[in-house]
């Protein structure tokens, strides 16, 4: 890392005591003293309290590219660290980059691949043009669709942020919008964060709240929308989160329940039982640390089409449809790859090649090269890869 012109050697943190790690941070110009950190942020924090600037503006001011101790590295530095990471005692197994759909293009995705990114989170928020415009989201559904298409061809996992109760939205519209996200071939994210809009003092939404042009959904409306979304979610999509990390004291009006997901899933369970339609969403079916007999598991291939790929979601499931592990196999349409190669030049894959975008087996994480009896150590991941290889060869 480049810290003010001084080259600081990288330390193997796994074999250093706390004092040595603290010394390393000090040398790099990174304070770890709580009082020092509080003083550095005090003025910006006060401006946020007074509504003079937003949290995002304060973060840019404190940690943006012009901040004096900002660290930099070349792509060669990154590549060397990737090599070290392969055999490290504590490995980084994924890098997630969050961005906007209109910032996703071949150039930016090529850089993200070079950085080692494995998943892209994009702020979709809505697919309704009226709602997007009302909330000053300067992206169109077409741009969002193009972002998903490119992410798939580059082999990334896609993680969409989606919001309910935005300015201009209604509960029925929100539910319909989400169904489009998870059923229209142009979108189909691998993961979703469903965030109810929160009213925070100092934001532009306060004026609409004051004049009555926006109101927070009541609990029945909000839980109804989110439960409908859970039921609409296909078996290859995971709802990773359902609430933002705002303290209840910062929320002027609207949902303040920290257990909102519990409430929503209880309602979704009731509706699923009434309609005899099981919940397919991944997180609802995860085995996590539960014990499983290997003989009870079945390998199921859920195949689906997107706008530019043929996808196979391979999953190990119990007789109750609980999920012990899964793999995402992507078979890009050859003509889509060839078209991008013609217009963009170099491309990460060739026509006819397949990609495994994700492999995940549930259970306790074991030490590298260690053994165990949970799902991760029974060859489930290897069997998923072998089956994916067979499908790709036969395609």
What are these language model-derived features?
Residues 1-159, 163-220, 224, 374-378:
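Conserved non-cysteine loop/helix-boundary elements of the Radical SAM core domain that shape
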Residues 213-336:
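C-terminal accessory regions of radical SAM enzymes
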Residues 350-376:
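Conserved acetyl-CoA binding element of GNAT-fold acetyltransferases
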Residues 372-390:
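Conserved acetyl-CoA-binding loop-helix of GNAT-fold acetyltransferases
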């Amino acid at each position: 890392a480049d810290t003010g012109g001084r080259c600081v050697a990288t330390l193997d943190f796994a074999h250093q005591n706390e004092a040595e790690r603290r010394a390393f941070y000090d040398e790099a110009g990174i304070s770890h003293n709580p009082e020092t950190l509080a003083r550095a942020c005090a003025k910006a924090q006060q401006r946020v309290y007074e509504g003079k600037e937003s949290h995002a503006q304060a973060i840019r001011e404190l940690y943006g590219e012009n901040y004096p101790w900002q660290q930099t590295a070349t792509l060669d530095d990154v590549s060397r660290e990737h090599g070290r990471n392969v055999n490290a005692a504590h490995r980084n197994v994924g890098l997630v980059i969050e961005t906007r759909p209109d910032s996703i293009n071949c150039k930016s995705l090529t850089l993200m691949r070079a950085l080692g990114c494995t998943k892209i989170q994009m702020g979709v928020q809505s697919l309704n043009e009226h709602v997007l415009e009302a909330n000053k989201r300067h992206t169109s559904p077409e741009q969002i669709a193009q972002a998903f298409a490119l992410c798939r061809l580059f082999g990334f996992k896609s993680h969409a942020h989606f919001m309910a109760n935005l300015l201009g939205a209604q509960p029925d519209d929100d539910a319909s919008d989400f169904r489009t996200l998870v059923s229209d071939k142009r979108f189909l994210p691998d993961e979703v964060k469903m965030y109810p809009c929160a009213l925070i003092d100092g934001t532009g939404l306060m004026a609409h709240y004051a004049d009555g042009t926006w109101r927070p959904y009541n609990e029945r409306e909000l839980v109804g929308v989110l439960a409908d979304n859970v039921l609409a979610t296909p078996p290859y999509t995971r709802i990773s989160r359902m609430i933002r990390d705002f303290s209840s004291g910062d929320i002027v009006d609207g949902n303040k329940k920290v257990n909102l997901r519990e409430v929503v899933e209880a309602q979704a369970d009731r509706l699923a039982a009434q309609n005899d339609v099981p919940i397919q969403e991944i997180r609802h079916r995860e085995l996590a640390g539960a014990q499983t007999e290997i003989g009870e598991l079945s390998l199921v291939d859920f195949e689906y089409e997107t706008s530019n790929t043929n996808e196979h979601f391979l999953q190990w499931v119990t007789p109750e449809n609980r999920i012990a592990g899964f793999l995402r196999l992507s078979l890009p349409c050859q003509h889509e790859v060839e078209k991008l190669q013609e217009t963009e030049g170099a491309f990460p894959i060739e026509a006819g090649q397949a990609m495994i975008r994700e492999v995940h087996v549930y259970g306790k994480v074991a030490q590298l090269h260690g053994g165990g009896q949970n799902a991760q150590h029974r060859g489930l991941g290897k069997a998923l890869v072998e089956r994916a290889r067979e499908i790709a060869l036969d395609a």
